[in-house]
Amino acid sequence: MKPDAHQVKQFLLNLQDTICQQLTAVDGAEFVEDSWQREAGGGGRSRVLRNGGVFEQAGVNFSHVHGEAMPASATAHRPELAGRSFEAMGVSLVVHPHNPYVPTSHANVRFFIAEKPGAEPVWWFGGGFDLTPFYGFEEDAIHWHRTARDLCQPFGEDVYPRYKKWCDDYFYLKHRNEQRGIGGLFFDDLNTPDFDHCFAFMQAVGKGYTDAYLPIVERRKAMAYGERERNFQLYRRGRYVEFNLVWDRGTLFGLQTGGRTESILMSMPPLVRWEYDYQPKDGSPEAALSEFIKVRDWV
């Protein structure tokens, strides 16, 4: 079946609505919407919830941009895209909770299509979701990965292990020699066996994110915490910033295509701290995190 960009766009707009409604139901606060246009073509809807009952900041962004040529970040690993016009659309979100016992989460689903006259379109889907805890709870990690595994199951037994490994490899801070969190799913360049199959998988990932995340939020949001936990949360958020600005392909793509900087950097935590040569106390819950986020099979 020929790729149907309009159908994908409708799904993404509905997904943004649904996720915002689900997060509002947990938090109580409303999202503020900011619609924007891109001079070179396209636009989007950025929605942000700030200082809610549960979430310090949650950003859920829809964007649909198009242009005459792909940026360097996209053609570097796909040279056949050079000289093609492109459309890129997606929903991307990051949730930064107040409570350090509630993990930060990120999800993204996207679709690219690149065309030139007289040639077949080049298209693919990408996306995934990943979890960044500050304090590790095994039952949360197992639930997160079990949800990821179960949504992958109808698409093949090898899908979850493949995309889990890709996630572990992708969300890795080389300069720190550590994982960003406990991973989840990551996929890109998905265009086989056909459009319908790939689109169905992307939809399953988009819908599966809140199934994976919200039960963890409900379980942890009322846990008591103090200044020590908050300081550690802010320190660990620094890793999030480092990854997004140094390693993340999506951030680079957005900035190189003249995307809307406010929306691209919406993933940044509102507060963060760095501390020179920070070492948590041996045997402390803070020290346990470095072991907890090491790659392992959770299910």
Swiss-Prot record:
Subcellular localization: Cytoplasm
Major location (coarse): cytoplasm
Alphabetized SUPFAM superfamilies for the sequence: Coproporphyrinogen III oxidase (SSF102886)
Enzyme class at the top of the EC tree: oxidoreductase
Sequence segments annotated as region (Important for dimerization): 240-275
Binding site for substrate: 92, 108-110, 258-260
Active-site residue numbers: 106
GO molecular function: coproporphyrinogen oxidase activity; metal ion binding; protein homodimerization activity
Cofactor(s) for this UniProt protein: a divalent metal cation
Pathway named in the protein's UniProt entry: Porphyrin-containing compound metabolism; protoporphyrin-IX biosynthesis; protoporphyrinogen-IX from coproporphyrinogen-III (O2 route): step 1/1
InterPro entries: Coprogen_oxidase_aer, Coprogen_oxidase_aer_sf, Coprogen_oxidase_CS
Keywords: Cytoplasm, Heme biosynthesis, Metal-binding, Oxidoreductase, Porphyrin biosynthesis
Entry superkingdom: Bacteria
GO annotation terms (biological process): protoporphyrinogen IX biosynthetic process
Any Pfam family: Coprogen_oxidas
EC number: 1.3.3.3
Reactions catalysed, as given in the entry: coproporphyrinogen III + O2 + 2 H(+) = protoporphyrinogen IX + 2 CO2 + 2 H2O
Subunit-structure text: Homodimer.
Family membership: Belongs to the aerobic coproporphyrinogen-III oxidase family.
Free-text function comment from the UniProt entry: Involved in the heme biosynthesis. Catalyzes the aerobic oxidative decarboxylation of propionate groups of rings A and B of coproporphyrinogen-III to yield the vinyl groups in protoporphyrinogen-IX.
UniProt name for this protein: Oxygen-dependent coproporphyrinogen-III oxidase
Gene name of this polypeptide: hemF
